[in-house]
Amino acid sequence: MQDNQNQAVPSAYFLVTVSQFCEKNRAFTNGGIRALIFNEHNNGLAKSGAIIRLGRKVLIDEVLFFQWVKSQHMGAK
């Protein structure tokens, strides 16, 4: 007899490459995003969890990235 328990699974992950992110969000340039990623430990992006590395591939969690962007705006006040 199998025990089928409903476990909480995130409904969706919005992971995209840097290039895909920039194509979808034209306000951001490829170089600009890469600069943010390069400095992620200094600008708080690393703590946000928005950048995911799988081997050499760098993926961006769009939801977490935009939460981080919004927190940067709130911190500027």
Regions found by a protein language model. Give the residues of each.
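A short, Lys/Arg-enriched interface patch at domain edges and termini
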Residues: E62-K77
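Short linear motifs in intrinsically disordered/low-complexity regions
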Residues: N4-Q7, E40, E62
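Major-groove DNA-recognition helix of helix-turn-helix-type DNA-binding domains
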Residues: E23-L59
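A detector for short, charged/polar N-terminal pre-domain segments
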Residues: M1-V16
